[in-house]
Amino acid sequence: MLLKMSAFTARSSDNFYVYDWRVVSTEKENSYTDRNGVRRQWKDITLMLRAYCVDEKGATACLRLGQVKTKLYCEFPDDYPLERGGAVWRSVRAKLKEAITCKHDQDESNVQLVDMQPLYGVGKATKTFVAISFTSEVGKRAFVNRVCGRHRKPPSAALKFPNNLSGERIRFHWINVPTELQVLVQHKLPFAGWVETGRLYEPRSRLTRCDREYCTDLPALKSSELLACVAPSLKTFAWDIEAKINDMSMPGYHVDDEVYMVSIAVSDGTDHLIITAPGECERDLVDALRKDKDIDNLNVHVCRDEVSLLLKFNQVTRSIGAVARMGWNVNRFDCVVMMARATQLNCVNTLLDMGFAKDVPGQVSTTAGRTYGKISPSEPIYFDTHGVLCLDVMEMFRSTYTKLPKYSLQYVSGKFLNASKDPVTLKDLNELHSRLMERSADVDRLRAVVSKYCIRDSRLTLALCNKCAHITSLTEMARITNTPIVMVHYQKQQRRMFHLMFSECMRENVAMQDDFGLANAAPFETVAATQKKQLSYSGAYVKDPEPGLYSMVGSLDVNNMYPTLMIAYNLCYSTVVDEHSPSAFTDDHFEYIRWEDHVGCEHDPVQVELKSLRSMFEMKALTDKRKRIGVTAITKYFKPIQGPRIIQKIMDDRYAESTCRYDDGDEFCENDDEKEVIAAIKTPLEMQRAAIRLKVLKSRASGGSVLCAKQCVKILKTRRGILPDLVECLLQARKRVRGNMKSVTDPMARDILDKSQLAYKVTANSIYGSTGASNGKLPCQNVAKVTTALGRMTILQAIEIARTERNVTTIYSDTDSMYVQLQDDPASNQDPWTYVRELATHITSKLREPMVIEAEDDIHAKVLFLGKKCYIGRKLFRDGSVARDLDWHVVITVRRDHSEYVKSAYKPPVYKVFADCTHDQFVTSIAESCLRLMRRTVPCEMLTKTSEVRNLGDGCQLVLCKKTMSWMWGDYKVARHEQHDRLQRENPKWLRDYYVSKLPAPARLSILLTDRARPPVEGGRIEFLNVKTETKSALAIEEISYFKDNPGCAQVDNMYYIQQLVNPLTKVSEAVWRRSNSVNIAIAPFIYYNKVLAQLSTRFKISQ
C-alpha cells in the first residue's frame, strides 16, 4: 500500500537480470512533546532494499523494494531456564527491550524465542535462541554494546539478567551477516540472475540515474528459471590512465605527479579519450587518430588542467551508463593514482559520484572489503559505487590462470588474443608530459601515438574479459554461492563458503556461528572457539615413484574424493566429534574412525628412511678414500653450518673451490680469484637423501610441529549433516547441468552452462578446504582431519585391491590418483583401455557409495618418472601409434620460474631419451643446447625469468607483526638491526639500504625500480635477467626493460643459465642410466672456457 501511494503509474510484471543488491540506510527526523512539555527529537533509521538490474533489452533499471529488517540471535548458556511464558523469560525480554535503542524495535513481536539446531556438536537436536529484529545496522550493534557494557568509555558494567547472569556471557549470532544476505536467502532470491517481479509502480521522484526505476513488493519477487540460460545484455567499459609519477612508493601524492590522459573503451564499440592538451589541438588529434582503421567511433575530450580531466572522467563514465567498469591492474595503480590526485585537488566526492544512485555517494574500498580507517597507498582499492561493478581483469586472470609466468598486459594479450600493445616506451610518455601544452608537429605526432597506445590498452583489456567470459564466471559463482559479484571477484573462497553455509543453515533452521571479527564475543569457551586453534594432523598419502622409464602406464582417479567422502561417511560440523566427547547418544549411534598420525616423529616413514640414509652416508664417508677439502654441500636446502662451503666436482678426481648460485642469490662459498659456476653433482644416494631432507624442511617451514598420536573420532549415524546434503546437492546440480549441455546448441547458452558446471565443481571441492582453514570463517578440525585420514585409507585400499586381486603394481600415487603398470605383452589381445576400466569398476565395488574410481582415457606408452609430482609421458593411441609430443608434468618446462631458454634446452635431451638414444647421444644433445647460448645466438627475451614480489609495505618501513611477533618489511620477515633506534635517528638512509639488502633479490629489484621511477610490477611478478657481478653483495639480476633501454649496463651471466640445467637433467640421467656425471661431461668444456675468459679479463684490467 505504501508503494502504491508513493507512485502514480502502474504496469504489469517484468523480467530483470539483477547483478547488484544494495541496502540503503535512510534517516528521518521525528519529534514529540513529553509530559513535562519539553520538545524531544530523535532520528528514525530504516533500511531500504534496492536491486540494480537490466531488462531483456539491456536497459538499466532500479527496483526499490521497500523497508527490510536485519536479525540477531542471542544464545544463552545451556543451563539457563528460558521457557516460553515463564517468569524468567518475561524478565529477560524486558531487559533486552531496555537495551534496544530504536523505539520501533522495542515491540514484543521483534523479540521472540525460537528453536534452532546448533551447527557445532552432537548435543541437543534443538536449542532455544532469542531472535531480535532491527530496523537498522546501527541499532543492532548498539544493542550488542549495551548488553555487553561496551556502549560507554570507559566500558561500564554489562547488563544483568535474572539468576545473576551477566550480559558478557551471552553469545550473539548473525552480527556480521549482511542484511541483504539475510533478506535474499529468506525470499529465495539469487545475488545474480533473472528475477520475475510483481506489479511495478513508477515513483514520483527518481533516486537513481538508471534508464528505468520502479517500486515493487519484495514478496512478489521470485527467481526466473525460464531465463536461466539467457545471457543478459550487460554494457561494460574498460579504462586506462597515463600519468607522470615521480615516487612509485607513493603514487599520485608527489606535488609534480599528474594524470594527463584517460581512455575508455565501451562494449558497444565506442571509444573515449580524455586528455590534457591545448584546446585548439582537438580536431587535429581526432583526424590523426581516425587514420587508424580500427578507430572509427572516437570521442575526444580536451581539458585545460588535471582537475578538469578528473571531472570530465566522472561525467563521461556517468553518461555511458555501463554496469561494470574494468581495467588492467587498476586496483594497484589506476584507482590508487586517481584517488590520490583527487585528494590533492579536493575533488574526491565528485570523482566518486560515478554510480547510478543520486542519494548515495560512492566510497573507496579495499579489496579485502574495508571502507573505514586510513588506507595505505600500497593497499589495492576500488571505487565502490551503486549499480556499477568495479573489476580488475588482471585479478581475474591471476585467479583463473594461476600458472602463467607473468601477468603483464603485453604477455596475456599475446597469449590469448594474439595481439600486442603499441611500442611506446616510458621515455615517450615522459617526453609528452614535459611538452603537454605545446603545439608543434613533433608534439602533435607524439600526442597521437601515445593516445592510440592508451586507447589500445583499454581495448585489449575489454577484449580479454570478453574472450574468457570472466563476467559470466563471476555471475554464475555469485548465483550458486549467494555471494555478491564484487565479493566473489575480490574476497575469494572463505567468504563464498560463509555465504553458502549461511544459506544452507537458514534453510535447515540451523544456528550458524559468526562470532569472527567480534572481539570478546563471549568469555566462556565454546565449540566454535576451539575450532580456530591450530590444526594438527598429517596430510594426504603420497607413494613416491622409483625413478625410471616405464612402459604401458594407466591412471585411475577417485572422482571428487573429498566431497564424496563427506557424503559417504556423513561428515559435518554436527556429526563428527572427538572420541571422548560427551553426548546424549549411545555408542551404537556412532561410527568410530581410528588411525595414526606420525609427522616428524621417530615413527614417521620419512624420518625412518632419513635415519637409514644417514647411517649409509656415514659408512660411505668412512670407506671413501678421496681427499676432502671441506664439508660437501648437498643442496641449497641442506647447507653445512660450520666449515668452508665447498662443492664437490666429480671430474677427473679433482677438486676446486667454486661458487654455486641459486635463484635467491645465496652462495655456498666465495672465491674472488676463480668465479667458476658449477652445480653440485650428486650421487643417487645423495639425491635421495636431499629429497627426504627437503620434505622434512618443508614440513617445518609450514609451521607443522612433531605429531605422534593415535587419532579417533566418532561420527553420528542417526542424523544427517548439513555438509553431506550440501555437497550432494552441488554434485547433482553439476551433473544435471552437464547433461543439459549435450542438448544445447546456442553458443552463448552453452557457455553459461559450462561456467555454471565449473562453479558447482569448484564450490563442492572448496567445502573441505574451508573446514581445514584454522583462520577461516567456519573451521572444524575434526571434519578436516577425518576427511584427510579417510582419503589416505581409500587410496591405500585401492592400491592393495589392485595388487592382491588383480596383480597390478602401483608405480606412483598422490592424494586421489594412482598410476599402475599394465601388461606390456605384444601377444596379449587385451585392450588396455578396457582393462583399466574393468580395474576401476572392480575397485569401486569395494568402496562405500557414492565413491567412484574412474579410469582416465589416457594410456601412456612410456612414462619417465623422476620423483613426486614430476613425470613425463607419451600417449598411446587406440590404433597403436604414439603421440609426437610429450606430456610434461611439473618439470622445468611447465614451471614459471625458469626462462624460456632453460625450458627449450631441457626438451631435446628428453626427446632423445624417449627415442631410445644412447648415453653419448644424450650428452651431445646437452652440449649442443649449451653451445647455442655460449655463441650468443639466444635473444635476451628467452633468458627472462619471472618471480613473485609480495607487498613491500608503505614507504618501506620495518613494522612489528603483533600476530607472529616478527619484524616485517611489508610481507617479508627480516631481522631487526641491533642499533635500529639509533640508526633510525642518525642515518635512516643507510638503515633502509641495510634492510633492503636482506630481502630476496626480486624484492630488492622491485625497490630499485621504484627508486628509478620505473612503472610498477604488473600482477605481482617481476621480469628479470641474471647478470654478472663483480662483488658478492651486488644485485645479480636486472629488470628486462631497463636492460633493453640501457645497453651495456650489465652482461648476461650465461653460466648461470647452464647451471640451471644441471640438476633437472641429472635426474633424467640417473633415472635412465643410473649415471650422475652425464651433465658434468657435457658442460665441462664451457666451464673451462668461461674460466679462461675470466682470467683473461682480469689480466687485461690489471695491465690497463
Curated annotation (Swiss-Prot):
Gene3D superfamilies membership: DNA polymerase family B, C-terminal domain, Helix hairpin bin, Palm domain of DNA polymerase, Ribonuclease H-like superfamily/Ribonuclease H
EC numbers: 2.7.7.7
Recorded catalytic activity of this chain's protein: DNA(n) + a 2'-deoxyribonucleoside 5'-triphosphate = DNA(n+1) + diphosphate
Highest rank taxon of the organism: Viruses
The keyword Chloroplast appears for this protein: no
Keywords for this protein: DNA replication, DNA-binding, DNA-directed DNA polymerase, Nucleotidyltransferase, Transferase, Viral DNA replication
A Pfam family matched in the record: DNA_pol_B_exo1
Listed GO MF terms: DNA binding; DNA-directed DNA polymerase activity; nucleotide binding
InterPro entries xref list: DNA-dir_DNA_pol_B, DNA-dir_DNA_pol_B_exonuc, DNA-dir_DNA_pol_B_multi_dom, DNA/RNA_pol_sf, DNA_pol_B_thumb, DNA_pol_palm_dom_sf, DNA_pol_type-B, RNaseH-like_sf
GO BP field: DNA-templated DNA replication; viral DNA genome replication
Family affiliation: Belongs to the DNA polymerase type-B family.
Biological function: Replicates the viral genome. Host DNA polymerases cannot substitute for the viral enzyme in this process.
Protein name: DNA polymerase
Organism of this sequence: Spodoptera frugiperda ascovirus 1a (SfAV-1a)
Lineage: Viruses, Varidnaviria, Bamfordvirae, Nucleocytoviricota, Megaviricetes
